[in-house]
């Protein structure tokens, strides 16, 4: 709707079509966004890395995205540094003896000046605008301006200087000696030269930590001594050592914040670790065909303090840098500036104070053939109805459709004198291929991740929703507020936590997890909800893994998907074992079935609270994507064609776009919420996807083929980055951030943690204090102004101490519900489709990972598996007796890569600690009113009154014999019982639900003619046999009727013959009385005794015999006079 209103306001009277043209965008507003009384600082640009690989210079974000080549042929021997304010990279090509520079986007490459061939170090003084170089042979440090002019020698007579560094905020420079392991320091004036330390080994890498004012270095040491990074303060004291993960000598290092980055010989990767401990490691794997990276630099505003960021610069400065369409006062500039100071399309006002728009259409120099429209800073050509604008953006051509096939054009085609030409709808332009359209009016949304705002027929700009900032590419949007987003994902036997850049990778929950495939979180109460497949219940815990508690323990069979309605305060899950979708409130007390008809094997599920809809995948015999209301009504089929096994499903709540993955087709697809505009996002390179999540500009999905988590651009499916690290089967995953689930109000739960007033803003709780109070340093509590003054006076260092705690890494303290596995190593794979690690092409087996052993790398099976690293098999801890399950009170259930303990019947607990249930005291026994219940270990006995004197007598009114069996005078529970009320309606077609203890499952006893777990399928073999038997009976009946009918016809014919003869004889008798007389006389003779019976019709009867299964293939036979005849009919005629 937003797009439609904006688009119509610009193009209400324009009906022409547009083609290629340059996009023009306005400069953005200031760096702060205001929402009520709360001010949010806009997020600065993301940090990225610049490094040399081979003879090319690359850049890449620390999370592995935006990997691109800046300089193709930079030289082989290179030293380099950057100037953040200029947005430029400087480097020295030692072979060509040139100092060169290029912008961070790869444009504007130029040569600054010639240099000597012995340059051994380069550093940028970003405050004074100077370049410092060391010459190892001349032993000098030279200083020039940023254009290579005004050269002067700062220091001379040095011993082979190299690795020069500068901290202009402290007015200090540092360098090392090539031959010895010495570190030196001087001020920027070349005075106060000091040697900080001396070491026997050569210092190969030297870097500065501007934040903590420390030096970090690595040395080319003896065998076994290359595994350390050393540091000291600016005075050479407080020396510290950390161990790095590389197996060879380091080539380069960089520092940013609390992270240290490095690369090493023979390793095509960049390591990222905690600079204090060397742990919390992330490995960024680059193209395996390349050489190790060198000259690593972290580019960010804070890497060069005092640099004015473009986001913090004045409007005039930003517009000058980008030559945007801004109006600004010249009072901020040189008053003698001329019109060249204004951006293109603008000119100086008459009073020379402002830049104003130039009306190119009025100047008649626009070149448009038919129509011209002026816009601020530019113009565009228009055409009347029936004409279209040609690719030059100037000429109009009559609209003549192309004949025949025009499928190569993404939108439409016209016929011109130069041949067929692809065209685009108004507001979009043709891409470089001349076939594909892009723009606000096309499906790619102009390349904008969120909002596309048209400026003209051929130009537009991108914008973002509240809470997001437009990034440097002017297309992507990133969250501008809140904590750092992270991933939560189920890894079959545990739940893990990881930031997008692979840092803070740890296990949150692993104890008694079994098999977990379903997971989601509640942003209001900051809770994780997950389903246990092996233990058949649903739990929840805090986002840090603490305070585990069971929520739903009855009626859960095989949960494979779970979704939390963070607004309606409910949870929904799919149960493939019961073929249902169920729901409950967050307490688990109001449990109900949502969908049970026409559903086979539901798996993934997503909820849209604002649309009040459920979306799910069904992997059964008729794979499909479906939707319904939150109550299960109004079911809608989203997709059913071209599906094999749709698994995960997710919603982009900002654009109302549905995403799903198909495990067997190895594809990710997207569509509108009603199933329209369906298209494939990625194909053939997503492995075995199981689950999805969407946030910012990316789709995340889990892969079982190469156990890992992958992300791609949510619009194009490109820029694939893979994160892996000792994963088994990563399943359900979610992105945790206040903006990930819009509309969440954390103030609803315990007032958002605020003592006084809580205001929700973009998914976060903003605490305010009542009049007369001020906020405490924790931002939650409120203090009286008097207490605040005391706090500021007597405890002056407290605020500093609190700030330090807030800025320090959060400690991970394990408890009973969590493990100490916070040292997991994450790997970022940015090598495209090529997959290779230190263990060789293809890596290790599916249940193994690659580890370092000295300078070698070997495959090692994951925990819970055994083998040679290439082939690893699950260890059955239950069979081996190596589990921690108490044998008397619990049973061991083996799972892939682990096991879980489940309390036996009659016990309760967490599976490892099980206590006897006193059924008699709880009233959960099955004894009759007249019996006495006696609790036993793991069970109970029912005793009849007077039973010892009368053993074996049943108790009157005892529990049903179907549930109890006789054992002397006691009634004990049988192994088969009925199902709980939650299973009502589970068995279909007349089936009876019952619990079988031996298999620990609820099963259905189907009536004859039906089969399946829920008796949902007809027994085709039984129906076929029944049909065949019915057919045989039908055939026999038909034949029998035919035989009877034939017999009746014969009898009727015989009776007719007899009647005819009788009448004829009577007629003849009347004509010959003498003959009749003589005949009557003779009939009374002795030989006429038998002839008397034949004077009337002889009696006939037929006996039919049915042959149910004739073996000789002959029809059923008939007999005369009671005799059975094998074939045909017989008579005495």
From Swiss-Prot:
Which SUPFAM superfamilies does the entry mention?
EGF/Laminin, Growth factor receptor domain, YWTD domain
Disulfide bond sites: 361-372, 368-381, 383-396, 402-413, 409-422, 424-437, 440-452, 448-462, 464-477, 747-758, 754-767, 769-782, 839-850, 844-859, 861-872, 878-892, 885-901, 903-914, 920-933, 927-942, 944-955, 979-993, 987-1004, 1006-1015
> What are the UniProt keywords, alphabetically?
Disulfide bond, EGF-like domain, Glycoprotein, Growth factor, Membrane, Repeat, Signal, Transmembrane, Transmembrane helix
Pull one GO CC term from this UniProt entry: extracellular exosome
Localization in the cell? Membrane
Predominant localisation class = membrane
Q: Which residues lie on this side of the membrane: Cytoplasmic?
A: 1058-1133
By its UniProt entry, which InterPro entries does this protein fall under? 6-blade_b-propeller_TolB-like (IPR011042), Cueball_EGF_LRP_Nidogen (IPR050778), EGF-like_Ca-bd_dom (IPR001881), EGF-like_dom (IPR000742), EGF-type_Asp/Asn_hydroxyl_site (IPR000152), EGF_Ca-bd_CS (IPR018097), Growth_fac_rcpt_cys_sf (IPR009030), LDLR_classB_rpt (IPR000033)
PROSITE patterns in alphabetical order: ASX_HYDROXYL (PS00010), EGF_1 (PS00022), EGF_2 (PS01186), EGF_3 (PS50026), EGF_CA (PS01187), LDLRB (PS51120)
Domain EGF-like residue range list: 322-356, 357-397, 398-438, 436-478, 743-783, 835-873, 874-915, 916-956, 975-1016
Disordered: where is this region?
1069-1097
Which stretch is the leader sequence?
1-21
Low complexity compositional bias, start-end:
1076-1090
Q: Which GO terms describe its molecular function?
A: calcium ion binding; epidermal growth factor receptor binding; growth factor activity; guanyl-nucleotide exchange factor activity; receptor ligand activity; transmembrane receptor protein tyrosine kinase activator activity
Start and stop residues of the LDL-receptor class B repeats: 87-128, 129-170, 171-212, 213-259, 485-525, 526-568, 569-611, 612-655, 656-698
Positions of glycan attachment? 105, 118, 149, 405, 930, 941
Q: Which residues cross the membrane?
A: 1036-1057
List the Extracellular topological domains: 22-1035
Highest taxon, organism lineage: Eukaryota
Question: What topology in the membrane does the UniProt record assign?
Answer: Single-pass type I membrane protein
Pfam families in the record, alphabetically?
Answer: EGF, EGF_CA, FXa_inhibition, Ldl_recept_b
Q: Which GO terms describe its biological process?
A: angiogenesis; branching morphogenesis of an epithelial tube; cell population proliferation; cerebellar granule cell precursor proliferation; epidermal growth factor receptor signaling pathway; epithelial cell proliferation; ERBB2-EGFR signaling pathway; ERK1 and ERK2 cascade
Q: How does it assemble?
A: Interacts with EGFR and promotes EGFR dimerization. Interacts with RHBDF1; may retain EGF in the endoplasmic reticulum and regulates its degradation through the endoplasmic reticulum-associated degradation (ERAD). Interacts with RHBDF2.
| Described function | EGF stimulates the growth of various epidermal and epithelial tissues in vivo and in vitro and of some fibroblasts in cell culture. Magnesiotropic hormone that stimulates magnesium reabsorption in the renal distal convoluted tubule via engagement of EGFR and activation of the magnesium channel TRPM6.
Q: What is this protein called?
A: Pro-epidermal growth factor
Query: What species is this protein from?
Result: Rattus norvegicus
Q: Highest lineage ranks of the organism?
A: Eukaryota, Metazoa, Chordata, Craniata, Vertebrata
Q: Which gene encodes it?
A: Egf
